[in-house]
Structures are given as structure tokens and as C-alpha cells.
Amino acid sequence: MTTVPDVFDETLPHPVAPRPAAWAADRARLLGAWVAAGARAHRSSLVLLAVLLPVVAVVHGVNFDGWPGRVTDDEGTYAAQAYSMQYWNRIAHYTYWYDHPFGGWLLIAIYTKLTDGFHRAATAVTAARELMFLLHLVSCVLLYRLGRLLGLRRFFAGLALLVFSLSPLALWYQRMAFLDNIGVMWLLAAFVCAASPRRSVAAAALAGTFMAFSFWSKETTLLFLPGLYVLLWQHRDPRNWRFVRRNFLGCLLGICGIYILYAAAKNELFEGPGHVSLEWAVRWQLFDRAPSGSVLDTGSDTYNVVRSWLDLDPYLVLAGIAAAVPLLALRRLRVVSALLLMQFGFIFRNGYLPNPYVTAMLPFAALCAAGLLDAVLPRALPRMSTDHGGRDGDGERHGHGDGDGHGDAVRERGGGRGMPEWTTAAWTGLRRGAVAAAVVGSVVTLAWDWTPKIHKALTLDASAPSRDATRWFLAHIHDDGTVITDDIAWTDLTIHGRRPLPVWFYKLDLDPEVRGHFPHGWKDVDYLMMGKPPDSVLAEVPIVAEALHHSVVLKSFGNGEIEIRRVLPPGCRVDIPPARCGPGPDSVPARSGDGDAQRPASGRGHPGAGAGEPARDSGDPLRRRDGVLSPGGG
């Protein structure tokens, strides 16, 4: 006879005792002590940042929406794509064709979701620029930290921060809602982690992660990957280098690889009939995109772009490039100087040069310009310690653990064995005088050139025509006519309930699915709200060009910068409502009296959606093979 085992005789695990109530308080005290210790270690830098950041915040925050004006559609495009993500659960408001990874406008969408930006801010672009302001403050802290990790003294790291922020060239591009600003912030974070004095596996993993985030924001930042890897190698610890590089590459490739997996999951990895593809987009970006000419050709677009940079600020980038050449001999600054020279060299290739290209050059130019002054100014040899170089009162290492930090310090101190003391003193005094003269001369020159430009940035509202045009259109145009506009106003009109949905003028000609809703071409267009594009753009959008030719101006803003036009088919007058102005004998059906459009403008979105509410999807995204060129795009 079998017996049932007596389970009560078995040894059971003891129940986990609840943590005492004081456990949370102990953890909080430990965290507070850790923060306090870090603050004490970096007290000098924290005080300096507490002085510099408010200055940067005022200069970048005052009138950030007014200057620059709405000079490129790219800002509106990224805001519209963020709106599409937030309200339509789509990657883009039209077909996403892999022009850029979508991490940049995903971050904009997260910000606008958390802050109700699209309904709170004056315009959609304003909400996106708010995020650029916050990201710039983060970038300033990261730039300062990177300078300190690369051996710059506090004064020169702060100097790099100031020129990086106060340059009119920086103000122009860092205020605008460009993906480059997001990518640069993540890039600086990756460099800070790579140069971490801890040399830990976690720091390497963070460096790879932030580099991947930078790629997801702007794919061109992958050009900085070799420099990041070299910096990580320079600051390596031989004891864990194998694990460091594995974690760095694993995080980088794993997160970047999600982009390829996304395309593969949607069957859009390779080119095929009836759909976009990542392969086609990469090939177009690298090989098929029309070049903008040589920088040496005064009639080329590349020359005009570089000329516009120098008109804003002829000093920062050129000074950084000039300083980068001798800094190649200094190991601790070799990576940033080589990366700046690499970016400078790319300008001379016969390819496409986007306007915001200079954005990624600015932090490296600032570090090189300040780094050369730091290298020339003699410094005292650091006190030796058991941790490869010791620390100063700010908790920073003087050496870098690369076998060359002490040699750099000796060279920069100006000392040398066998030299007479009077010779060393004279050489030291000469170097100090040269640095002092350079700093004073730079302050005078930059103040003379930058002050009126910064004053303009703080006072001129160059965006008013665009905002006024949108307000006037919403207040005075109440019929359900189809409006063709730029992407700057697209989101604002959509948020305020304009139905049928407005159409971005580029899509009217270049997207076959959108063009299919305009069987009579320009005669199916009722309103235009945009400035006159240049002739080179009009050549790509003939339907828009014809609509402009057959239109009359209802209202003009900013001396013709933005015009609201009514398109008049043959036999129609401006006083006749669009519903009674058909395109001809074979006109489209008249619109119903309840405001629902029989002819939708974009094939998606419910025409009767209320003001400020997202339009409901009414089908699959538009599909096409051809890419859409975005003016001034990156």
C-alpha cells in the first residue's frame, strides 16, 4: 500500500521578510550623499555653468520664434510628421520614404504630447522650436563636459561653450527645428561617455546607445563613428577593453539595426514595384541626388550656402579649422580636430550640401578654437598620484590613461630638460602674452561683429508674416475649397479643422496618389497660401506653377513674402464662391451643403472633423516610388 508523502515534514523556504520602513530612507540618504559628493567634486564647474547657462538661455530663448523667420519648409515638415505620429499613429503625414530615420520627429512628438505643444504654442513650428531650445541647453552642458574631459581648463571649456552658443551662425541654425540639432545633442552625449574617466563597460554601452540615437535622429552623424571609436580606444583600460568594445558595438548595431528590421518587416527593404524602399532612398541620397556644385564655383548652390554661413559669422568655423591643423599633433585633441577637418573636406566634394550641414561643425570648431588657446597657455605640471595623473579641485583628471597625458602636460607647460631657466621663463611669458592678446583681440572683434546680429536675433520678428497669413486665412476663408500650402502652415491649418485637408505643394506634382485627386490639374485647386517658389522649384511642380499663373492675390504679408491667392478657372470671377466655379464642362461634382468635400484633397482624413481634432485615417498610406525633394533638406 502506497502512502502519501507528508509534505508537512519537508523543509520549505522561509518567506521573504518585508523590508523595514527605514530602507527607503536609507536609500534616499545614500543617493543624497552621492549627489552631494559629486557636487563637491565639480563645484567649480557647477558655479561656472550657473553663470553661463542663464546667459545662453536668454540669448537663445528671447524671440526664438521670431528669428530666424520661416525660411525653409523643413521645419514645417518635421512638425507635421510629429503631428502625424501623435494623432494619426503614422510616421509621416504623407508616404514615409526613408528620407531620414524617424527618431528626430518622434522626439518632437513626445515633447508636444507631454506639453500639449500643438494646441498650446502659437504655431506647430513654435512648439518644435521650444524643444530645440531645451536641447541646446543640454548640448551646452555636454560640450563643456567634453571639453573638460579632453583636458581643457575651465576657462577655455566655458569659452568654447560661449562661442558655440553666441555665434550668430549658431543662433540661426540652433533655433530652427532641424534634425541636425537633435543629432548633435546625442552625438555630444556619446563623446562624453566615450571620454569618461571611469572607462567602464556601462559608459561604453551608453556611448554606443547615444550614437545610435544620433543616427536615428540624423543618419549623417554616422560619419563621426570612427572618431568616436578612436576616442573610446584612447581612454581605454586594457583590463576591460574587450568587454568595452563589445558592449559599445553591440548597443550601437543593435539599436541601429532596428531601422533595417523595420523596413524588412514592411517589405520595404529592397526596391520593388508599388512601394518605397530603404535601398532606393539610400541609393538616392548617396549617388542619385543632384549635386549642388563645387564650393569653388561662384554660381553654384554650394558656394551660396557657404557664403550664407560666412555672412552670418566669418569667424567661428574658420578659426576652428585653422586651430585644428596644429592640434593634430596633440593627442588629447586629435580626434575633435580630425573630425572638424574631415567635415571641412566634405564641403569640397562634388555632392549635395544641405544648409544645416554646418550645425555639426559648430561644437568641434568651438572646441578646437578654445583648445588651441588652452594648449598654447602654459600650465603647471599636475601633482602625481596613483590614479594616472591626479585630479584638480574640479574632480577632473589631468592625465588620460593613454600613455601620453604626461607628455602633453610637459609640452604645454613649456618645460624641457637642459633649457636655461631664463629661456624657459621668456618662452612661458611669450606664450602667455600671445594667449592674452588672442583672447582680447577676439573679444573686441567678435563684439564688434556679433553684437548687432545678436540684437537683430533678439528683436526682429521675421516669422510674423507666416503666422499672420495663417490667422487671416482661418478668419476669412470659410468655404471648403482646396488649399495648396507649404508645410510651415500645413499643421496649423489641420489643427484648426481645415477640411478638406490642405495639400503640401510638393506632393501635388510629385506624389502620384495625391495627383490622382486632381484630375483637372490646376483647375481643381481653389486657394494657394505660400510664397512664390524659385524658378528651379516651379520647374519640378508644373501644376502649382499653372495654379499660380491663373490666380489672383487676396492678401499679401511681409511685402509679398507670403501670399494668399484665389485660383480662377476660365470664366470665373473672384467674387464667385469656389463651389460654383467648376473647372469646365467636365467639372467635378459640386460640394454638398453640409461642408463635406466630394473631392478630398489628400485621400485621407475626415473632412468634417472638428477644429483642433486629428483627422481619422481612411485607408492605407499613399504609396509611391519616387522621392520628394524637400527644399533645403538635409
Each model region followed by its residue ranges:
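Aromatic/acidic, Gly/Pro-rich catalytic loop(s) in extracytoplasmic/lumenal soluble domains
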Residues: 2-7, 515-634
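Transmembrane alpha-helix segments characteristic
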Residues: 50-55, 159, 320-321, 328-349, ...
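Transmembrane-lumen/periplasm boundary regions of multi-pass, lipid-linked membrane glycan transferases
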Residues: 84, 225-329, 351
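Short periplasmic/luminal acceptor-recognition loop of GT-C membrane glycosyltransferases, typified by
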Residues: 99, 448-452, 456-514, 520-537, ...
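Transmembrane-helix motifs of polytopic, lipid-linked glycan transferases
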Residues: 126, 130-151
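Membrane-interface transmembrane helices that cradle and orient dolichyl/undecaprenyl
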Residues: 149-151, 188-206, 214, 326-327, ...
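Short acidic/glycine- and proline-prone juxtamembrane loop motifs at membrane-interface regions
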Residues: 169-182, 354
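Transmembrane alpha-helical segments
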Residues: 217, 428-461
